[in-house]
Amino acid sequence: MKNVLRRMSLAALIFGLLLSFSMPESGKAAFWDTKGDNFIHDPSIIKEGNIWYTFGTGLGTGLRVIKSTDGRNWSAAPSIFPTPLSWWKMYVPNHEPHQWAPDISYYNGRYWLYYSVSSFGSNTSAIGLASTDRISSGQWRDDGLVIRSTSGDQFNAIDPDLVVDKDGNPWLSFGSFWSGIKLTRLDKNTMKPTGSLYSIASRPNNGGAVEAPNITYKDGYYYLFVSFDSCCKGVNSTYKIAYGRSTSITGPYYDKSGKNMMNGGGTILDSGNDRWKGPGHQDVLNNSILVRHAYDALDNGVSKLLINDLYWDSQGWPTY
């Protein structure tokens, strides 16, 4: 991943403070004011050439894609797999006609898109994979099943996130409720699991309400971002973003207070505000951009794309 070093002059600092007053909904100069067709749920973002792409949960017409030339003004792009693939019903018989929570990454010269097939409230689920040489081509190869879960499992195979460790090895984190967040190493060629599942976060005393993992590596630490509590209830959503870190990709991950994330630990990064309710299902790009959805209280609770610049304090913890 590419890290961004910021050196802010006094003039830039003053400008930033002035700018912050023009953005009362976020209170931060780092807030990207997204407009246009910015409806999204469970976003994952990437930039190909001069075009930003954000992928999200689809509502019956394939995985949703929106694009932008500046990261602020968004328009719809063609969806992915608008016609259901035949193998989805094999593993998830009660699959509803939409796909959830995609994750887009670039690795070894190819774009990899992991996504979820499930039904609400069930852990009979599957994670699928699609790939392409160029997002702009609109041509995606179906790479099939990655991992599945059934009602007899204590985990839920949804909310995938690809991460590459400091040695260049790909891993997949995933999970939602049940016993929490899992991690497995991937084969560099097939981009599918090679063996063990590691448990890296859970909330045993909070109804299991942890999901949507995202891992990034920076300055000797792996940072695990997760979403706590409940999404999908519009302005009544209680979603919030929490995090911890570890010197090993397989954990243990600890929050700022030293609590293990396997025991419900997690320092809150974003719990929303008067306008933006239930922020979550976050994605971190290049250690410098924080993306998530939130429900707009000024627009009937519609789920929209939120983007902030992401910073790191003197102790190496994320902030925005």
Protein language model regions, located:
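Cleavable N-terminal signal peptides
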Residues: F15-G16, E25-G27
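Bacterial N-terminal signal peptides
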Residues: S9-S20
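Carbohydrate-active catalytic/glycan-binding domains of CAZyme proteins
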Residues: G27-Y320
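Short, intrinsically disordered, low-complexity terminal segments
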Residues: M8-S9, S26
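Positively charged n-region of N-terminal signal peptides that target proteins for export
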Residues: M1-R7
